[in-house]
Structures are given as C-alpha cells and as structure tokens.
C-alpha cells in the first residue's frame, strides 16, 4: 500500500527517534530516485531506518529498470508457455527447444539513456551486457541484432549520436567475434533528445543443463569472475529509470566502459567452467552490479548470500562500500560453485586472463549481508530487494486520449484528388509526380538502405551467416553443432531472426501498432521460409506517471498479447525501458514515440530453400499474396494511407488511424507463404511495409538490378492508395511461368479445403530493361530507371551525414 506524506509529516517521521539517521534523508532519496513512500516502506520492512549503503541498494533494486514497478502487472498477461519453451521470463534469457538436442537462447535489452550521454560506450556496453545474458545461461553467442532510433539527420547532434552508437556496436561486436546480422533503424523528431539503442543476442547450447541464477547449497562458496570493479557506471540503474535532462546528459560517470577482448575471454572461460559441472548458479553483473547479482541469486534460490567487499578485485584505491555495491563495471560475473572446486576453477579463469576470487558464501538466513573493512555494512532481506518490490498503482483512463481522437478524425477524403501523373503536395501546395513521390520516399532515412550502418558490422564472423543484412526480410544463420557428441542434427537447418516496430503506427494507435509489430515480425520470418517460434520484446515508452503514457503502455501490452496468442509466438522475456522523455531547459517534456520493439526467432529446416527479396530472373511473374488490389479496397480498413509514410513524408501529415490488423488473415498468409517457399514454388519474397506496394517493388528491383512491369487493375480507388497505402498481410513473390501454374494450383487446392481469407493477384513481370514501369488502363503512372532508384536508396543516409 502506497503511503503519501505532507512534507511536515515526513519530516516528523524521519526525525523520530526510531528512524533517525546521520545522513540527509531528503537529498539521499532524490539521489537514489526513491519516493518518501518508498522510504517509509523500507523502514516498515526493516523495523529500522536503512543505513546509507542499504538505501543505495534499495534505490537501484527498486528502480523501474530493475524491478519493473510500473509495468509488472501488465507483463503478467503475456503468453509465456508453448511446446518449445524451456525457459520463459524471469531468467537471464529465454530458451527454446529447436530439436536434435539443441536449444536457442535469446533476449533483447535496452541501453537508451547511457547511449544518449556517451553514445560509443553506451552502445558498446549494451552489446556486452546482452551477450553476458546469453552465455550466463550456458549458451555460445552466435548472433547480434539491434533496433535503433534517432532524431532527424538534419541536426548535427543526431548525426553525432548515430555515428557514435554505430561505432560502439561495431567495435564491441567485431572485437568479441559475434556477427551483427540484422536490425532496424528509424528516425523521428521525438527521439532527438532520447535515442533508443536496443540490442538483441542469440546463443546456441547443446546440453540439457541450463545454467540458472538461483543460488543453492548452504555454505557453498561465491566466486567473483571477470574484470575489476571501478567507479564507472555508478547508479546506472537509477539513471536509466528517470527522464533525461541537461543535468543527466552530463552524468558521464553513470555510463559504463566496456572491454570486448576481456569479454571474449569471459565467454570462453564461462562455457568451459560450466562443462566441469562445478557451477551451481551464475549471474552476470549488469544493472545494479554486485547488489543486483547477490540479491537475485539469493532471492531466486530462497537462500542468503554473504559478500565480503574486501575480497572484490578493485580497479581503484579507496573505494567505499557504496561504490563497490553500485558500480556497474562491465565484464563481471558471480558464481555459486561446489566446495572444493575453487582452485581448479581459479586456474581455469586465470588461464583466460580473468580476475577470480572467492568473495562470499551462501547463507541459510535469507539475507544479503555485506562486509567491508571487517564490518557489516548492509544486512537486508533478499526478497525485499529482488522479489517483493513495490508496484506503482496507475489509474488507466477508460477513453481514448484526446490527441488520438483528433488524429482518428482524419480521412483520405481530405487529400487532394489524384491525377494520372501525380498529386498536389499539401506540404507546399506544389505538384509532385508519382516518379518523384517514389524517389522522395526512397530517400527518407527510415526507408532508405541502411548499408552505411551495417557495412561497419562484421556480419560474417563465425562463418555461419546465410543471409547478409539487407538481402531479405529476416537475417538467417546456419545452425552449426558446437559439440562432436551431440545428436546429429540435419546440417542444413537455420535460425531466422528479426526486430520490428513501426513506431508511427504505435504512436497513432498503441494497440494496433503493437499487434502490427508482432505480425510484421512473423511475416518477415515467413518470407524467408522460417516458422516463427517465440518473441522477446523491448518496451520503450515515456513516463508512466502521465495518464497518456501509462495508457499507451497498457494498450501496447494488450496488442502484443493478442498477436502472440493468435500467431502462437510466446514471450520468453525482454526488457522495459520507461521515462524516455527529454526535459528541455524551459521544463517542456518531450516524450518519445511509444516503441515496443519485437525480437522474433524462427526455425528453418532447410536453408537451401530460403527466399531473399531480390528478383531472380527476367520474365518471372510477380504476384501478391494477401489482400487484393480491387475496387473494394476503398472500404477495406486493413489497407490505408492513414499513418503511412506517404502521408508523413510527402504531405507532412503524421495523422490518421493505422489500418486494422487481421490476425487470422496474417496467420493464413504466413502459412501459405512458408509452404510455397518450402515446395520451391517461388523464387523471391518480400513483405509490403513502409511505403506500401510501390516502395516494396522498387526495393526488389534495386536489390536485384532487374526492372519490373506492373499493371494495376482497374479500380475506383485513389491512385495514391493503390501505390503507397500500407497494411498487413501482403507479400510480393516472384516465380517462373511454370511455377506460377503450381502457385495457382496450390492456392486452389487449399481454397477447397476451407475458408480462405486471402487471394493471390498477378501484378506483372520482372523485366531486363532496368526500369520500373507501373501502368493502369494503358496509362503510364511510373517510369523510373533502376539506377536512379538505386542511387537514391543506397546513398540517402550517407548524403545526410556528409552534407
């Protein structure tokens, strides 16, 4: 129960003889990001006032970053079970069974605020942290992905943030030897003061023994392994749980400093140590450092841990207990090991160039007891720190916020009438041809090629990358056995992975936008032939203390839940990042677009049958699977110019309600797509995303070098709607004439078996003329040279940065 105080009452409380302390409580609470009600609850639980070290421990462990005090009730509604799920939310990472004795471990996490302050180190340590979550479970890291958001690139500050973040990601990933195989990047003014850096990692394990974090074995030794502990990253968890301001932007000590070469040794040493059977439990030291690792290991194991800070390897002299406990120095682990194994493990870790010390033991009493300079400096119930943490009570508004009610009034009828060759641009009241509309959309950084970014990443290290960044709708890596003694898996299996979120859609309808993010991720996996298995999510939102902010978060969680249930993709865990707001000097607060990033993984049984997005040969037929281009498109709310890239970037309007998400239709389209890929009926596949039909066709042309002849059916629909409307459940495929016969035959056969919600539509043919030609009723609508499309698309971000 939340207790509220008048200032007078709180002063009386803290000055009472029972709770009197030597430090200034008010300033200490402000420093730790705690409320007066939190302090009263701490005193109630302890039946005494906390000392300054203990208050710091509560500050980080009761922060949103560590305990999800604002979001936990919403997360409980996610579907978390399934036939392949071995480990769900609550551990360092999720684990799914992919057959043949192999398990896939994966998770996504944010490093947003540190990257705003120090983009290189913030992004680099974000990569290091997510890798530790993976190998702490006993899995070898095999791939990295990322989802990034920045402000517009006409601002030098945003360019600097982009360059720093990309450099940090590439530095850490390249040095540690894990390929960065995919991701997504978006740009919007809402991220100008608060960029988003979400890192996802995948790992492979071939043992039945999953290393968990719950400590056990009374009296068993606690082992510290890895890097030394310094003063970097002090209070990082609390820092990540508050809005960014001019003061916090200057708070560089809250950003950690990473060493990827040491992490590489830590990976190998930990995996070797796990094979000995000596390790009972393992926990990496991420947010809240030693405090969090000790608290979580003790709480999950329903035991206690005694930690002697005098034995912790220190990087700097004169460190206080407070600094040891809250430091977030990187590349550190805490183990509980079997008695008698200490020396053997010590030799192992030293051989890999790591610090290793026995720093404590497991206790029967369920407390975290900390010793420094021979004295007990903290003694707290483990559950109070890591399990029985506060939950904020928010009143969920029961009506759509006013800003959305206004946006949802917008209709396509408010746009100028379309002409055969173009449209009047609302933004400046000038005519723009369809050719130039397409070129303009391809030059937008959110749509344009991200080759400037991914060419800085080593995506071929480990030699398992099957699909390189930008080649297909999802990244694909080969599953290569890590152990000679494992059950012999098929050599040609693969894992597909993707990260997705259309933040503009989520801003304009949090529930529909979030459903769409899940559906698009599943559609992208299906477009390479992968069966979606499960998701991890990163919920990036603004302050939940504002009614609209909490409503957005709640509606988003509802949308994710609905989509995951419909598409059979359980949630294995993830991360919540709140208070992504920028406070300007005039006290104006700018919230980011709500951005629930969906990381999804899928299984491919034969990587020789995957599809990329490029046309394969001239004269192939181009088909669209899903919603048809027919007269009734005007009445179909599943396809719309509302909330579209066309509306925002051509007309300067970010408005309207995003299209309806038909999850049953999505499921049918995905299953059909996977099957025709498996049967070898189609040569390429690409979903229709930002920019709609014409941008998707242009993308296929650019990546292949071939052109396309597209003939739009006669329609009463607006031309811009046919060309650039957006919506789900639509995929382009190409196939030969003979394959087209098989495509129609297979569609007819399944149509006879039951109710089919989608159609297949012949749109045209691949050509060798190096041109994209779009016509309707013998009128040429678009006629663009592929080289012009390619130059615009490939160089857009580079030109913005070097202008």
Curated annotation (Swiss-Prot):
Record keywords, A-Z: ATP-binding, Cytoplasm, Ligase, Magnesium, Metal-binding, Nucleotide-binding, Purine biosynthesis
UniProt cross-references to InterPro entries, sorted A to Z: PRibForGlyAmidine_synth_PurL, PurL_linker, PurM-like_C_dom, PurM-like_C_sf, PurM-like_N, PurM-like_N_sf
Subunit structure, interactors included: Monomer. Part of the FGAM synthase complex composed of 1 PurL, 1 PurQ and 2 PurS subunits.
SUPFAM superfamilies recorded: PurM C-terminal domain-like, PurM N-terminal domain-like
Name the record gives this protein: Phosphoribosylformylglycinamidine synthase subunit PurL
Residues annotated as binding Mg(2+) 2: 133, 284
Reactions performed catalytically: N(2)-formyl-N(1)-(5-phospho-beta-D-ribosyl)glycinamide + L-glutamine + ATP + H2O = 2-formamido-N(1)-(5-O-phospho-beta-D-ribosyl)acetamidine + L-glutamate + ADP + phosphate + H(+)
Biological process (GO), any one: 'de novo' IMP biosynthetic process
Top EC class of this enzyme: ligase
Pfam family, one: AIRS_C
UniProt-listed Enzyme Commission number(s): 6.3.5.3
Protein source organism: Prochlorococcus marinus (strain NATL2A)
Metal-binding found in the keyword field: yes
UniProt: Mg(2+) 1 binding residues: 109, 575
